[in-house]
């Protein structure tokens, strides 16, 4: 399942901007796959925690998306030339901003997961080993928060 389904589901995840509703959809899709694997329907009224316990696993899909995004961010921010992708990641496009509440930017996810400012995140990526460690901690934190939510 992880080889076939998750790779298709997370295709292009490096460029996603994740809000709470997308996070919930990722969790729901993962649980849907687990339920199909066990041939359990919602009519059976089984909790997500019991499904995860039976499979002896934790929710992992959101952590995979976090890892891909942070790895890609590190790769792009270390590039020397200033290209369009780096400009977009920095959140500095040209033109006027639209009305209403600002959309969640790519860098907002990075700041939330790493606990750094935008400038601090760009500086932290220069040391690849430290950035890998920070990415690993962010993935563990994302999976831990997900597991706690599943058990409630």
Label the predicted regions:
Residues 1-152:
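Short linear motifs embedded in intrinsically disordered, charge-biased segments
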């Amino acid at each position: 399942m992880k080889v076939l389904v998750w790779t298709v589901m997370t295709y292009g995840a490096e460029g996603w901007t994740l809000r709470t509703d997308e996070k919930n959809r990722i969790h729901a899709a993962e649980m849907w796959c687990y339920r199909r694997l066990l041939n359990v329907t919602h009519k059976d009224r089984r909790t997500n925690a019991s499904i995860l316990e039976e499979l002896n696993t934790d929710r992992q899909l959101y952590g995979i998306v976090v890892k891909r995004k942070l790895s890609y961010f590190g790769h792009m921010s270390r590039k020397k030339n200033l290209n369009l992708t780096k400009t977009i990641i920095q959140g500095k496009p040209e033109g006027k901003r639209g009305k209403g509440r600002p959309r969640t930017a790519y860098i907002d996810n990075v700041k939330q997961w790493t606990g750094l400012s935008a400038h601090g995140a760009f500086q932290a990526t220069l040391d690849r080993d430290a950035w890998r460690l920070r990415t690993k901690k962010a993935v563990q934190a994302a999976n831990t928060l997900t597991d706690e939510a599943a058990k409630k």
